[in-house]
Structures are given as C-alpha cells and as structure tokens.
C-alpha cells in the first residue's frame, strides 16, 4: 500500500488554524506505519525489535498551500534504498478529489542500527521486501 488517506483534525492545526509542520510529519509517519503493516510487517515486533532499530536521521517538509481542519488528504509514499543500512521515504501530500493538487512534499531518511552498540546494521529481509514493493520507479 503506497496511498494513505486521512482527515485533518483540529488537533493537527496551530494557533493560526493551519496544519502545524510537525503534525504533517507525524501524519506522514502514520502513512509509513500503515504501509509497513499492509505489507505484512507486524508493527508491534517491528518497533520493539531488540536487535535493530530504525531511527529517522533527517526530515524535511515543503508546503505549497495551507491545510485546514476537515481537509481530506491522500499521502502517496515511495522509497529509495540508499545503502544496505539506510533508506529514504518521499511523501507527496494532496487533497482527495476533486482537488488532487500537490499540497506538500516531505522526506525522511532512516538508518538501521544496533540499539546496544549504536552502530549501523543491515536492514532486515522483511524491510528489504517492503522497500522493493514501494520503491520509486522514476
């Protein structure tokens, strides 16, 4: 699953009434989790694995127009494996039809590490399969 739909909630907005930038990054992370789950990865064990953790080491987001409470959005994610220990996810955020223009674009970079040594470690086979199923075909 590369598409995730969601309604913007009041709690996602800031004092100006628009989506707070960190909230949209959090929503993008929801799309990442939903995609992992749809591919058959058990989220409970994925996030509690004691041998490998996958922290985000870089995040960026660009907004092209504001989002408001009640807006229905669709997030399309694609992945790119950068190294045997690292991958990147690109999120394209748009309004659900009839207005399907690009609202925002985000990117997160993730690195697999051993939680005890904090050293890089290869991505798991299940994560490699997920990356292949969601990779950017451009």
UniProtKB/Swiss-Prot annotation:
Key word tRNA-binding present: no
GO BP annotations, alphabetical order: phylloquinone biosynthetic process
Pathway(s) annotated for this protein in UniProt: Cofactor biosynthesis; phylloquinone biosynthesis; Quinol/quinone metabolism; 1,4-dihydroxy-2-naphthoate biosynthesis; 1,4-dihydroxy-2-naphthoate from chorismate: step 7/7
Cross-referenced Pfam families: 4HBT_2
EC code: 3.1.2.28
Swiss-Prot/TrEMBL keywords: Hydrolase
Xref: InterPro entries: 4-hydroxybenzoyl-CoA_TE, DHNA_CoA_hydrolase, HotDog_dom_sf
GO terms of molecular function: 1,4-dihydroxy-2-naphthoyl-CoA thioesterase activity; fatty acyl-CoA hydrolase activity
SUPFAM superfamilies: Thioesterase/thiol ester dehydrase-isomerase
Catalytic activity reported: 1,4-dihydroxy-2-naphthoyl-CoA + H2O = 1,4-dihydroxy-2-naphthoate + CoA + H(+)
Entry annotation: catalytic residues: 14
HAMAP family: DHNA_CoA_hydrolase (MF_02101)
Family membership: Belongs to the 4-hydroxybenzoyl-CoA thioesterase family. DHNA-CoA hydrolase subfamily.
Described function: Catalyzes the hydrolysis of 1,4-dihydroxy-2-naphthoyl-CoA (DHNA-CoA) to 1,4-dihydroxy-2-naphthoate (DHNA), a reaction involved in phylloquinone (vitamin K1) biosynthesis.
PANTHER family the UniProt entry points to: 4-HYDROXYBENZOYL-COA THIOESTERASE FAMILY MEMBER, ACYL-COA THIOESTER HYDROLASE YBGC
Name of the molecule in the record: 1,4-dihydroxy-2-naphthoyl-CoA hydrolase
Organism ancestry: Bacteria, Bacillati, Cyanobacteriota, Cyanophyceae, Oscillatoriophycideae
């Amino acid at each position: 699953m590369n598409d995730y739909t969601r309604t913007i909630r009041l709690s996602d907005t800031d004092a100006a009434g628009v989506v707070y930038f960190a909230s949209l990054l959090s929503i993008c992370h929801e799309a990442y989790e939903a995609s992992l789950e749809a591919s058959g990865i058990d989220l409970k064990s994925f996030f509690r694995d004691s041998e490998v953790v996958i922290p985000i080491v870089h995040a960026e987001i660009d907004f092209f127009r504001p989002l408001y409470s009640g807006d229905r959005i669709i997030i399309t994610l694609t992945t790119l494996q950068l190294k045997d220990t690292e991958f990147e996810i690109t999120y394209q955020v748009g309004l659900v039809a009839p207005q399907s223009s690009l609202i925002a674009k985000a990117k997160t970079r993730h690195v697999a590490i051993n939680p005890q040594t904090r050293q890089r470690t290869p991505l798991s086979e299940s994560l490699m399969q997920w990356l292949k199923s969601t990779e950017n075909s451009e």
